[in-house]
Amino acid sequence: MALIAGPTASGKSALAVALAKALGNGTVVNADASQVYADLAILSARPTDDEMQGVPHRLFGHVDGSQAHNAARWADEAQGVIAQAHAAGRVPILVGGTGLYLRTLLYGIAPVPEIDPHIREAVRALPVAQAHAALAEADPAAAARLGPADTTRVARALEVVRSTGRTLASWQQAREGGIADRVALAPLVLLPPRDWLRDRCDVRLVEMFDGGAIDEVEALLARGLDPDLPVMRAIGVPQIAAFLDGTASRDEALAAAQAATRQYAKRQFTWFRHQPPASWPRHIESLSIDIIDNLAIKLRETVLTR
């Protein structure tokens, strides 16, 4: 199984298709949290039919926006798709930038029990400093690792230890359901120059705005979905919604979406630089057509020798 990971706009999709064609029997499997949604074809940069070039693509646009997809559900789906590809004599090529999805598929998920809703509500109501102080008392190691400003992770660690009596780290050591030890993996992480990546993000947002993203969000808003659903919080949706309701100009909405995309790409870049195993190859150059073809050839050889 091949795996191509990296931040948004780094060229993963084009490389995945090139690899699939070089192999002759590749199937591209989506590992991006936004690209699962049917409602976000444009804003998620889901590959078009032309970009797919006849290569089979799986787990793209198969989830309705009214549903809240998650890593555990995606990993279950991905395991099924991977098994189907292998049974058909094809090579699955995982491609995406959602690190949590990839980590859950490969290494499993921590079997943390459901959190007591009263504990969750109490934890989420704590002021930032107080929450971090409480975590320092209940789980010193987590508090030392997480800064007070990392409010989401602080709250998660605190609610887990309060609700279960065990630290989140101890639960994570008991991960179950991963496939890393059952597949021969050929990974590649794309970490192109930051300036090149930022420019790509900005240009792509312009193309999205000019290519139907506004109509896409207008249709999404017309559904009257819960604003807390992931599809409603996807990058570009709130910004375009502000333009549509008159609280922002088109240029302001575009600039805000570009800024949000750059920030997201920066977080992804940092995650993929540090979190995957050191043995995973990193490609640190920008991607051109020639480089994509060369990478596909090299990755093909890696796949075939695993």
UniProtKB/Swiss-Prot annotation:
Pfam families on file: IPPT
Residues binding substrate, per UniProt: 8-13
InterPro entries: Dimethylallyltransferase, IPT, P-loop_NTPase
Keyword DNA damage: no
Enzyme Commission number(s): 2.5.1.75
A GO term for molecular function: ATP binding
Family (UniProt): Belongs to the IPP transferase family.
PANTHER family associated with the record: TRNA DIMETHYLALLYLTRANSFERASE (PTHR11088:SF60)
Protein name in the entry: tRNA dimethylallyltransferase
Protein source organism: Sphingopyxis alaskensis (strain DSM 13593 / LMG 18877 / RB2256)
